[in-house]
Each structure stands twice: as structure tokens, then as C-alpha cells.
UniProtKB/Swiss-Prot annotation:
May play a role in regulation of apoptosis. The gene is Chct1. The lineage of its organism: Eukaryota, Metazoa, Chordata, Craniata, Vertebrata. Residues 44-145 are annotated as: CHD1 helical C-terminal domain (CHCT). GO terms for cellular component: cytoplasm; nucleus. Keywords: Cytoplasm, Nucleus. Residues 198-212, 227-236 have a biased composition (Basic and acidic residues). This is CHD1 helical C-terminal domain containing protein 1.
Amino acid sequence: MEASDWQGGEGDKPLEKVGSVPCLERSSSTVPTGDALVRHAKGLSQDTFKICKEYLRPLKKFLRKLNLPKDLPQKKRIKYTKQSLEALGGHINTFLQHYCRAWEIKHWKKMLWRFVSLFSELEAKQLRRLYKYTKTNQTAKFLAALCPLDAPERSLLANQEDCLPRLCSAWGLHGNISGMKERLSKMQAPGQEVVMLEEPRSSHCSRGDSLRKLPQKPKLKKKRIKERLESPKSCS
């Protein structure tokens, strides 16, 4: 295919995005398609839109899952979003590697992610960033970018970090608190928090046991002195 074909009618005037778009406020069951969608594709000409549409047609179910119901539990939203981005991002990379020349890669990466963004509330750049975090297993950054305001576990983590200096002081620990905060912030599973918070307690208990096992020297000295004082009387 010629380079002019790959540019997808780049010389054509891009269709402007309408300011108020009722059909973009959609649920998972109402996704705009065809001409209704291309009218709102800013920066995508009709030819470019058709190429993106045909190439991503096999992944329609993943495109739909980019716009999930608001009442869906957060755990499922994160799971479905990651799965969709992994599938779509991998498919886009295959297109770039096998069908594009070096100087065309940047253009078509931008166009394909822009097409994907039509099915999501997020912009193309945000979706690309989320895909990057998913691909490199940067879970913390992925969660921060996907749901910066919707994370109750973040407030819980913040409260734990505030309590950490007081806990260390109460247990008589004077270690590296900033290092402990860093470890706590990296934790994902709730069970791990309990393990970390119980470690100082166990060390405290072992300290107490060792103190109880120390010999009581003062009592032995008093007993010996008493025996010496009583010994002359017994001899007389």
C-alpha cells in the first residue's frame, strides 16, 4: 500500500468535534457507531476513521468495556479496564510493527488511540499512559491515574501513615520511619498491613521475655548477708 493511502486522507479537512454531544454520554449498551461517531471524531478524517474502525473491529467487546456502568464495583472496573487496554494496546502495536513504516508509526499510533478514546471518558493520552503502566506492571501509578478521587484505600493508607510515628514511639522503636512509610505505601493486599504492624509487637514481646529471664541478683545478695549474720549465733 502506498504511503498516501496510509495517511488516510490526511489532506482532507478534519471533522470538527461538536461542543455538546448527547450520544457521547453513554452507558455500556449505548455506544455510538458509524457516521454518528465519526461526526465527533476530532482530528480523524473519514478515511482515517474507516481504517481504524476496520482494524479494531475484532476488538469491539474490549472497546465497549472502556465505558463501564458507574455502579459497577471498583475492583471489576479496574480489572475490565486493564484487560481492555492490554488487548487494544497489543493490537495497536501489532499494526504499527507490521503495517507501518518508521516515519508513519507516530501518526498512526496517535490516530488509533484517538479512535479508542471515542469509546471512553478518558482522552487518548490518558489511555496510552494507562496502557503503559499496565504493560510495565506499575500498578500504583495505574490506580492513581485511573481513579485519583475514587480510592477509599488511599485515605486508609494515609491514616495509617499518620499513625505510624505514634505507634513507633509507643513501642519504643526509633528506626527509619520514612523507610517504613515507603514499605507501607507499596503494599497492595490488606493482609500484608497486619503482618507489618504485628512485627514490632512480636519484637516487643521477645524483649519482655528476655527481661523476665534475667537473674535477680539483689535478692541473692540479701539472702547471703542474712545467712552470715545468723551463722555466729548458731555457733555459740
